[in-house]
Amino acid sequence: MWKEFKKFAMRGNVIDLAVAVVLGAAFTAIVNSLVNDIFMPLLGIIIGGIDFSSLKASILGVDVLYGNFIQQIVSFFLIAIALFLIVKVINRLQREKEVEEAAIPTPTKEEQLLTEIRDLLKDRSL
């Protein structure tokens, strides 16, 4: 049983998934900081410092905290926008890298053979 578990745990997919989960957790902290520390204060300035989370309605002595719900919706959209912008930048960087790699022409078979012949002739003359 231990051997089966070890084989399962050491498969590439499981390790890749574990790395993805750890990186995802770290990335979550970055996105949350971007939203909470940068976007939310800017939004607060734009909307006049209103804090939705404190809004509530009392119905028959029971507080309905609809403000927190609104705050979470705003946070969701800000996180979605932040992720969109981050992915957009990453995709652009990848496209630029692909264009650079495509711009470097790979030598044809003839060019490779000529290069080998040249190198052999150089070695002979030394």
UniProtKB/Swiss-Prot annotation:
<comment type="similarity">
    <text>Belongs to the MscL family.</text>
</comment>
<dbReference type="InterPro" id="IPR019823">
    <property type="entry name" value="Mechanosensitive_channel_CS"/>
</dbReference>
<dbReference type="InterPro" id="IPR001185">
    <property type="entry name" value="MS_channel"/>
</dbReference>
<dbReference type="InterPro" id="IPR036019">
    <property type="entry name" value="MscL_channel"/>
</dbReference>
<protein>
    <recommendedName>
        <fullName>Large-conductance mechanosensitive channel</fullName>
    </recommendedName>
</protein>
<comment type="function">
    <text>Channel that opens in response to stretch forces in the membrane lipid bilayer. May participate in the regulation of osmotic pressure changes within the cell.</text>
</comment>
<keyword id="KW-0812">Transmembrane</keyword>
<dbReference type="Pfam" id="PF01741">
    <property type="entry name" value="MscL"/>
</dbReference>
<feature type="transmembrane region" description="Helical">
    <location>
        <begin position="70"/>
        <end position="90"/>
    </location>
</feature>
<keyword id="KW-0407">Ion channel</keyword>
<dbReference type="InterPro" id="IPR037673">
    <property type="entry name" value="MSC/AndL"/>
</dbReference>
<comment type="subunit">
    <text>Homopentamer.</text>
</comment>
<keyword id="KW-0406">Ion transport</keyword>
<dbReference type="GO" id="GO:0008381">
    <property type="term" value="F:mechanosensitive monoatomic ion channel activity"/>
</dbReference>
<feature type="transmembrane region" description="Helical">
    <location>
        <begin position="8"/>
        <end position="28"/>
    </location>
</feature>
<keyword id="KW-1003">Cell membrane</keyword>
<keyword id="KW-1133">Transmembrane helix</keyword>
<keyword id="KW-0472">Membrane</keyword>
<keyword id="KW-0813">Transport</keyword>
<dbReference type="GO" id="GO:0005886">
    <property type="term" value="C:plasma membrane"/>
</dbReference>
